[in-house]
Amino acid sequence: MTQAILELNGIEKAFPGVKALDGACLNVYPGKVMALMGENGAGKSTLMKSLTGIYAMDAGEIRYEGKAVNFNGPKHSQESGISIIHQELNLIPELTIAENIFLGREKTNAFGGIKWSEMYKDADALLKRLNVKHHSRQLLGELSLGEQQMVEIAKALSFKSKVIIMDEPTDALTDTETESLFKVINELRDEGCGIVYISHRLKEIFEICDDITVLRDGKFIGERVVADIDEDTLIEMMVGRRLDEQYPRIDVQHGEKSLELFDVSGPGVHNVSFSLDRGEILGISGLMGAGRTELMKIIYGALPMTCGAIKLNNKMINPISPRDGLANGIAYISEDRKGDGLVLGLSVKENMSICSLDQLSKGIQLDHHAEVTAVEDFIRLFNIKTPTRDQIIGNLSGGNQQKVAIAKGLMTRPKVLILDEPTRGVDVGAKKEIYQLINQFKAEGMSIILVSSEMPEVLGMSDRILVMHEGRISGEFMAKDADQEKLLACAVGKTVEQNVEVTA
């Protein structure tokens, strides 16, 4: 068997109240893609931070190119040939693409001046390799989130590293961008680069990876060859049990209409009409840029409605701010939980109650007892894994952060719950828990809009599905009559025969 270029053996790391790593192991082989799998909180990110010197490990050994090493920080590991593409962007919007790629490593002449033309040329070559249709002189802030992620990847490639760690690299990418990334990964593999690929998207793991390492509760569970394992076995290794049904949809008798839109238009949205019943899950499908998030923000009041009308519980509303949306009984859980949904420097309690302070106050005084009681109730209900309600939320796993974001919306006691990519970056075990919670809200008569780029999720959880294309509704289906081919056809603007049951 090929000798590993990078070996992590018996790594241990503890934080107050929790042992994050307990004998974790990982081998990275030259010319191979190693998937690093595990539920949120399994220790994947902690292991990578221990490798690159962000965290000092408590025990264990790291060997790189056959020698024991102990990196004292990301700069040290990067200079040694190990690059990491973080899930959170580490870029500056006010700088150009080229400046971001070569920040701190600018090419200079004998007099200390920057060789701009050479730097732009090298940056353009990296962008071309990733099929990014922008010039490196363009400001980064003008790019979409997915395009910025491609710049982050270009930055990692610029180091010409021997090992590249990719943490959820396709999380914000379109299908086309993902294809471009996979093409580059295959090229890097052929060049002998060792790649660590961290993702919750099982389809990607089986498509692009050679081997799989699984962590659970900070422990090393096993290393397998991708060709020798199936999804069910992999999931069982990750969660320690078999998941009987991935999408536990329930049938609930729908109530009267709760939300109606009439020819609503706004930024990126054109003449959209639909209705939503109580006890119904309405799925919204479509490609990135189709206007799904923009439509949700118009309903919530985060974007302006330029024409049309919205009726909530038979009353016309015109939300012009998120405060209006909350006052009307609409809760919106953003697709960007770290940018819009949560304040990472605040505690679990503060994040969960931040939108419900009016309901939790007596006059002008916050009722701290009521706040603590409500927060503790949701921590138990959602099975949120946190040492205490006062834990800084940025220290929680992605799945637990997402549960807090959903709980924050539910504490406002909404009539309509909008979930925009609720399971993005969430592991299979936490997904199942979120689906069960969604079903519980549905059974209680709540109206739910589920926006998701994962077609199996939309098909598996929704009662009815709308498809958007270029800001318009391009298709409507009862979930039982839909499939991925129909949704994708509508998503790209093709005409598809649609079967929709009309409710009175």
UniProtKB/Swiss-Prot annotation:
<keyword id="KW-0997">Cell inner membrane</keyword>
<keyword id="KW-0547">Nucleotide-binding</keyword>
<comment type="similarity">
    <text>Belongs to the ABC transporter superfamily. Ribose importer (TC 3.A.1.2.1) family.</text>
</comment>
<feature type="domain" description="ABC transporter 1">
    <location>
        <begin position="6"/>
        <end position="242"/>
    </location>
</feature>
<keyword id="KW-1003">Cell membrane</keyword>
<feature type="binding site">
    <location>
        <begin position="38"/>
        <end position="45"/>
    </location>
    <ligand>
        <name>ATP</name>
    </ligand>
</feature>
<feature type="domain" description="ABC transporter 2">
    <location>
        <begin position="250"/>
        <end position="495"/>
    </location>
</feature>
<dbReference type="GO" id="GO:0016887">
    <property type="term" value="F:ATP hydrolysis activity"/>
</dbReference>
<dbReference type="InterPro" id="IPR017871">
    <property type="entry name" value="ABC_transporter-like_CS"/>
</dbReference>
<dbReference type="GO" id="GO:0015611">
    <property type="term" value="F:ABC-type D-ribose transporter activity"/>
</dbReference>
<keyword id="KW-0677">Repeat</keyword>
<keyword id="KW-0762">Sugar transport</keyword>
<dbReference type="InterPro" id="IPR003593">
    <property type="entry name" value="AAA+_ATPase"/>
</dbReference>
<keyword id="KW-1278">Translocase</keyword>
<dbReference type="GO" id="GO:0005524">
    <property type="term" value="F:ATP binding"/>
</dbReference>
<keyword id="KW-0472">Membrane</keyword>
<keyword id="KW-0067">ATP-binding</keyword>
<dbReference type="Pfam" id="PF00005">
    <property type="entry name" value="ABC_tran"/>
</dbReference>
<dbReference type="InterPro" id="IPR050107">
    <property type="entry name" value="ABC_carbohydrate_import_ATPase"/>
</dbReference>
<comment type="function">
    <text>Part of the ABC transporter complex RbsABC involved in ribose import. Responsible for energy coupling to the transport system.</text>
</comment>
<protein>
    <recommendedName>
        <fullName>Ribose import ATP-binding protein RbsA</fullName>
        <ecNumber>7.5.2.7</ecNumber>
    </recommendedName>
</protein>
<keyword id="KW-0813">Transport</keyword>
<dbReference type="GO" id="GO:0005886">
    <property type="term" value="C:plasma membrane"/>
</dbReference>
<dbReference type="InterPro" id="IPR003439">
    <property type="entry name" value="ABC_transporter-like_ATP-bd"/>
</dbReference>
<dbReference type="InterPro" id="IPR027417">
    <property type="entry name" value="P-loop_NTPase"/>
</dbReference>
<comment type="subunit">
    <text>The complex is composed of an ATP-binding protein (RbsA), two transmembrane proteins (RbsC) and a solute-binding protein (RbsB).</text>
</comment>
